Each structure stands twice: as C-alpha cells, then as structure tokens.
Amino acid sequence: MYDVTSILQILPHRYPFLLVDRIIEIEEGKKAKGIKNVTINEPFFQGHFPGNPVMPGVLIVEAMAQVGAVAILSKEEFKGKTPFFAGIDKVRFKKVVRPGDVLLIETELISLKGYIGKAKATAYVEGEVVCEGELLFAIK
C-alpha cells in the first residue's frame, strides 16, 4: 500500500493534476489498485458543469493512467522515468462520476516491449464500472 507521500516519490504529477490518493494493492511492474477521492473542491468542477458537477471523462482516464504508472514506475528499471500517453483504445464511459464518489481503479499490464506498453484499466464507483479501456504508454 502506498499513501500520497509515497505516490509523490514515484509520479511526476503534482496538484492540481495528481489524480490518485492511495494505492491499496500493487504488484510492481504488473498491476495496481488505487483510489481517487472525488470532492467538490476539485478545480474542474467550477466549470464542468455549474450546478451539475460531473468529473470530466478525460480526467477519469488520466487517473487510471496514473494508477498504472505507479505500478510500472515502481519497477527498478523505470524508477525516475516519466510516463507518456501513446494511445487510448476501447475506452467506454458507463456512468458519471460526481463529488463524493470514490473511484476504485484497477490497472493491469497487458504487454511491455522495451519502453512501450499497454495496460487494461477499469474504474469503479460503489462496485459499478464507470469507465474502462486500454491505455498505451511510452516511458522516457
């Protein structure tokens, strides 16, 4: 398990773009489970949407990528590196995410060739899938 202090030592992301609060399970270099506590204090809720706050789908995908990045960057050979999106495939949004929700995010590495990889990611709220897809990444 990693708390936010440990996550900050692994990921290069910082406020307001750090979108993972805790890693609750990890198999370094292979898979991870993390949590994002969604609060009304998130800066994006000011404009998305006033009176009807909904977490932007692209930020759910980014949160999924950050959980996956913790798993990959925990691997000794990738420590200190920066992960970049190389592509996003088969992403589907099933439900909206609102303030007060807790995103449970699961990511698992599908393939890794050198510094290019693909992971399957799923985000849940209260046991229901809100988003799923495949994330392609490059590590530099």
From Swiss-Prot:
GO cellular component, as recorded: cytoplasm; membrane
Database matches in HAMAP family: FabZ
Main location: cytoplasm
Active-site residues, as the UniProt record annotates them: H48
Pfam families in the cross-refs: FabA
Catalytic activity: a (3R)-hydroxyacyl-[ACP] = a (2E)-enoyl-[ACP] + H2O
Primary role: Involved in unsaturated fatty acids biosynthesis. Catalyzes the dehydration of short chain beta-hydroxyacyl-ACPs and long chain saturated and unsaturated beta-hydroxyacyl-ACPs.
GO function terms (MF aspect): (3R)-hydroxyacyl-[acyl-carrier-protein] dehydratase activity
InterPro entries named among the record's database cross-references: FabA_FabZ, FabZ, HotDog_dom_sf
Domain of life (superkingdom): Bacteria
Annotated family: Belongs to the thioester dehydratase family. FabZ subfamily.
Protein name: 3-hydroxyacyl-[acyl-carrier-protein] dehydratase FabZ
EC assignment: 4.2.1.59
UniProt subcellular location: Cytoplasm
Gene3D superfamilies for this protein: Hotdog Thioesterase
Originating species: Caldicellulosiruptor saccharolyticus (strain ATCC 43494 / DSM 8903 / Tp8T 6331)
Entry keywords, A to Z: Cytoplasm, Lipid A biosynthesis, Lipid biosynthesis, Lipid metabolism, Lyase
